[in-house]
Regions:
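Extended alpha-helical targeting/anchoring segments
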Residues: 1-330
Length: 330
């Protein structure tokens, strides 16, 4: 679907109060929009905070998948080779030192070895935002893009993570100066993004802690809540509204336009739907997510996992590399 067709359809369906699922890739070249039942016929299923188009979500097929998933399973990621990461990081650091960017997310695909199928991962995950696109990819994301309820738009940027099992983990995370600097930067960026589409933008909550479960254990994640006020006719302009804020600031960086160009140069390949967005309009409100924690099927029995890392001007190459490699393996 072309960009203009997506905008036209999104505006028309939202304006008429017709529920739909939407998906937009990171590069804003692939635009998908389906009624929930049509998405299901195409093998595209979502579960967004318990709302789903999977027919067996209350039992039946979905329950069968949960029941047959092994209590112990293999899930191993092979992190990107550090020399490759270091080369990209050096390029990013050069741009940061030249003032072209001051916050940039850098990510690479990593092979995943698992005895779980994509559909099993979809059902087994406890993430609030889940998406299964046939045998192409699965997303189990903790990160909201935007929510819209009434005339209020909200975003919840996530920046700052630590292993919850570490001693005094919460204090260490909240008092880390580097984490604070990054979080301040992304909050400012998201506030600016919301200001392009909303009035009276404000930070409603600053740096609160969420707990995220992974198969390796629990993580502490720092988020903030930013909100603004939309005009009464926002549904009839939902397509333009979404696209004006893309790509998501939390997975690109600041300043956004220049940083996106640096990402393309450093990573050397397209992200596709990874770090794009997906969401639902339920006839009145919007719930959407950033497509992080993403596994893609690239061949028979071959999966590639992707998750985000981060680099800033005061980061040390070795530390940031280990952090990104660790996040990709979770």
């Amino acid at each position: 679907m072309q960009r203009s067709q997506f905008i036209e359809t999104c505006n028309a369906w939202a304006g008429a109060g017709r529920p739909f699922l939407f998906m937009i890739d990171y590069e804003m070249e692939q635009f998908l929009i389906f009624r929930p039942e049509e998405a299901a016929r195409r093998g595209i299923f979502y579960n967004i905070k318990g709302r789903t188009n999977f027919a067996g979500a209350g039992g039946g097929a979905a329950q069968e998948v949960r029941d047959t998933a092994p209590p112990k399973f293999r899930f191993e990621a092979v992190p990107v080779a550090f020399p490759r990461y270091e080369k990209a990081f050096s390029l990013v650091k050069k741009h940061i030192l030249h003032g072209n960017s001051f916050l940039l997310n850098l990510t690479f695909p990593t092979p995943v070895e698992t005895d779980l199928g994509l559909e099993q991962i979809f059902h087994a995950s406890a993430a609030p935002y889940r998406l299964l696109s046939g045998d192409r990819f699965v997303v189990f994301s903790p990160e909201t893009f935007v929510t819209i309820g009434g005339n209020t738009i909200r975003s919840f940027p996530m920046k700052g993570t630590i292993d919850a099992a570490l001693p005094d983990a919460e204090r260490r995370l909240l008092e880390n100066e580097k984490e604070l600097w990054e979080h301040n930067t992304i909050v400012d960026l998201i506030r600016n993004d919301l200001s392009m589409v909303a009035a009276d933008v404000r930070v409603a909550r600053f740096r609160y802690i969420d707990r995220i479960r992974t198969h390796r254990g629990e993580l502490l994640q720092v988020s903030s809540e930013i909100e603004g006020r939309l005009g009464d006719g926002w549904r009839s302009g939902l397509g333009e509204l979404l696209l004006r804020m893309l790509p998501a600031g939390s997975i690109s960086g600041a300043p956004k336009r220049k940083t996106v160009k640096i990402i393309a140069e450093a990573e050397g390949e397209r992200r596709g739907f990874f770090t794009g967005i997906f969401g639902i309009f339920d006839g009145e409100a919007v719930e959407s997510a950033v497509m992080i924690r993403y596994i893609e099927r690239v061949g028979a029995g071959k999966d590639v996992g992707r998750d985000v890392g981060r680099d800033v001007g005061n980061a040390v190459g070795n530390t940031s590399g280990k952090q990104t490699i660790g996040k990709q393996a979770d």
